[in-house]
Regions:
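RNase H-like, Mg2+-dependent phosphodiesterase core
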Residues: 1-40, 44-58, 67-185
Length: 185
């Protein structure tokens, strides 16, 4: 798995929806790289014997390429289908595809949206937990990395606008890591 991120500056500049799309594409691109999912490239996925699973080619169900792949005994494999489920009503990933800021994603995902997806799909719920744990660890690490950040209590509030956090912003101003578009002061 991968957790994509957008910086506070990117979110302020682009808006949250577009920044979420770019962050998701960064994660998808990282997963594809780690799995070796690149058209025409040698797969980094290995067979049990340790040898390469073969070249990656584009295969379509019912097409001649797909049929010939089945006859190659693993020397060439069909390009996997990548799918994604987003928790909520908006597909912010597809909107960010092929934009200037988005990373190269040669296998675009077919995106499905599901309101309250974390309540209906274990994969969505798991992804939500992984994202939140990653964010919480990042906030604790940031809080411990610089004594200047202690007043904001990120290790405890994880960046949410608690009373103590808002008081610290009012007294000390936002840090370079704060999203100024939220106007918390």
């Amino acid at each position: 798995y991968a957790v994509g991120q957008a910086s506070n500056t990117e979110i302020d500049e682009w808006g949250i929806t577009y920044a979420l799309g770019v962050a998701a594409l960064r994660a998808l691109s990282q997963v594809e790289r780690e799995l070796g999912l690149r058209l025409g490239g040698e797969s980094t996925i290995k067979k049990a014997s340790g040898e390469s699973a073969g070249k990656i080619v584009e295969g379509r169900p019912g097409g001649s390429v797909g049929e010939s792949i089945g006859n190659c005994e693993g020397s060439v494999r069909a390009l996997p289908k990548v799918a994604g489920i987003l928790d909520g009503p908006s597909d912010y990933i597809t909107k960010a595809l092929n934009t200037f800021d988005a990373p190269d994603v040669p296998i675009p995902a077919d995106i499905t949206t599901k309101v309250k997806g974390d309540q209906h799909c274990a994969t969505v719920a798991t992804a939500a937990v992984i994202a939140k744990v990653t964010r919480d660890r990042l906030m604790v690490d940031l809080a411990q990395s610089n004594p200047r950040y202690a007043a904001y209590e990120w290790a405890h509030n994880k960046g949410y606008g608690s009373a103590a956090h808002r008081t610290a912003i009012a007294e000390h101003g936002p840090t370079p890591l704060h999203r100024v578009s939220w106007h918390l002061t």
